[in-house]
A protein has these predicted regions:
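Active-site and adjacent substrate-binding regions of carbohydrate-active enzymes
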Residues: 1-459
Length: 459
């Protein structure tokens, strides 16, 4: 009798291996109420268009209540919808209509930090004795100034912010309005698992988990020795118990639902990346690494994102290394997102002569690799970088804070603005170009971010 050998995990079918994920930046997709801001009802209006494209899964950037210091990545209430985007009833309708077309919906959740306006932090910052104090990471003033850590978005560059009522510094690896959660506290993890269940019980099909390697830190905060350890990333993330936390989250939540998970793993190496998605480890399904975003030109010393062409050889080698490293895990394939330049500008050519061919070539690349392909809304049109010329045109907190820092230090802001034309995050966040009308069919009101002037030709 022949012996049946089950297929390897990499060959086992799963809906999230056979789908195309289409990323929607809700603020920029479609405005349904004429206030210049995209919203949930605008997405619902365009579901037939997306279904006609062959899109099977939507990923929405954060839609939760937020003061918008970082466009929704500073969440003040995980169970409420941001008023700019609509109501919970609007979300329920969007979810129902998405499922009615045989499509699925993923939500973008930020679990490394909250807004400083979240009720947890508003309580935590009042007193060391407050039970919510241990929901966050602090350094008491009696121990002196904490060891240096760099903030990604803070204008001063320091990831520690002093809080007088508690006589201590709180940690924020991103903006000071985004205090980092203390995942070592089991009460924090229990709260997060309840949030995940809330949305899964509503029927969402999974999550993209923002900055997931950052949830675990070495909270002794050793001094960074750049001579001994030039790669500083392990000082910030990939800390003790990271994979214990992810396994626990899978066991307590994800394994009980028909859902998928993809973690954002910036700066994660292929050797580390497989740990997140190896089927036998039961953590996440996919990892959204930044290999393509970090590609360098092997013949130039400068950063390729400032206009120097990338190395095709390096791009091919990077994807080959990741494919080999993840083994039976399942990779992701993407060339752009809301934090990166437009893919046709970064990896192809956005000149009139080559834009169309570049967009088609890059899309073919995404669809022919092993792994789940991710598109950013507008990639199918060949939407390109907008190339703002004045700082006032930018909305992004990272760009604006960096500019102020350079201005204060008397450094070259004109060169910085030229670089932002190539690498700035707002390049990917301009309103979707539905048609050639004044505001590209996105809205009848002035949009929150300027429409790319090429929308009369590219729509």
């Amino acid at each position: 009798m022949p012996i049946f050998t089950p297929p390897s995990p990499a060959l086992q079918k799963a809906w999230w291996k056979e789908t195309i994920v289409y990323q929607i930046y809700p603020r920029s997709f479609k405005d349904s109420n004429d206030d210049g801001i995209g919203d949930l009802n605008g997405i619902t209006e365009k579901l037939d268009y997306l279904h006609g494209l062959g899109i099977e899964t939507l990923w929405l950037n954060p839609i939760f209540a937020s003061p918008n210091a970082d466009n929704g990545y500073d969440i003040s209430d995980y169970r409420q919808i941001m008023p700019d985007f609509g109501t919970m009833e609007d979300f329920d309708r969007l979810l129902k209509e998405t499922h009615a077309r045989g499509m699925r919906l993923l939500l973008d959740l930020v679990l490394n930090h909250t807004s400083d306006q979240h009720p947890w932090f508003r309580e935590a910052r009042t007193s060391r004795e407050n039970p919510y104090y241990d929901y966050y990471l602090w350094w008491p003033e009696e121990q002196g100034h904490p060891p240096y850590r760099k903030s990604h978005f803070d204008e001063e560059g320091d990831a520690w912010c002093y809080n007088a009522p508690t006589r201590s510094y709180y940690l924020h690896y991103f903006a000071r309005q985004q205090p980092d959660l203390n995942w070592q506290n089991p009460e924090v993890r229990a709260e997060i698992y309840d949030i995940l269940r809330f949305w899964l019980d509503k029927g969402v099909d999974g999550f993209r988990l923002d900055s997931i390697p950052y949830i675990a830190k070495d909270t002794s905060f050793p001094e960074i020795d750049l001579c001994k350890y030039p790669d500083v990333f392990p000082y910030y993330s990939l800390g003790p118990h990271l994979h214990d936390y992810l396994h626990e989250m899978n066991r307590e939540v994800f394994s009980r639902y028909d859902c998928t998970t993809v973690g954002e793993g910036s700066k994660t190496s292929p050797e580390e990346g497989w740990k997140f998605i190896a089927p036998e480890r039961q953590e996440l399904d996919m990892l959204y690494h930044f290999g393509a975003a970090d590609i360098r030109n092997e013949t130039e010393a400068d950063d390729p994102a400032t206009g120097i062409p990338y190395s095709l050889l390096a791009l091919k080698r990077m994807y080959a290394e990741w494919d080999a490293a993840v083994g039976d895990g399942w990779p992701t394939i993407y060339l752009g997102n809301h934090d990166q330049p437009r893919m046709v500008s970064r990896f192809g050519s956005d000149t009139p002569e080559w834009r169309d061919l570049s967009a088609k070539m890059l899309t073919m690349f995404l669809l022919t690799m092993r792994g789940t392909p991710y598109w950013l809304a507008g990639d199918e049109l060949g939407m390109a970088n907008i190339r703002f010329t004045r700082i006032e045109e930018y909305d992004d907190i990272d760009t604006r804070n960096h500019y102020r820092k350079l201005l204060r230090e008397g450094r070259d802001t004109e060169q910085f603005l030229r670089e932002q034309q190539e690498i700035g995050r707002d390049n990917a966040r301009t309103p979707y170009q539905w048609d050639g009308s004044r505001y590209a069919g996105f809205s009848v009101a002035k949009p929150w971010l300027r429409v790319n002037p090429d929308h009369t030709e590219v729509n």
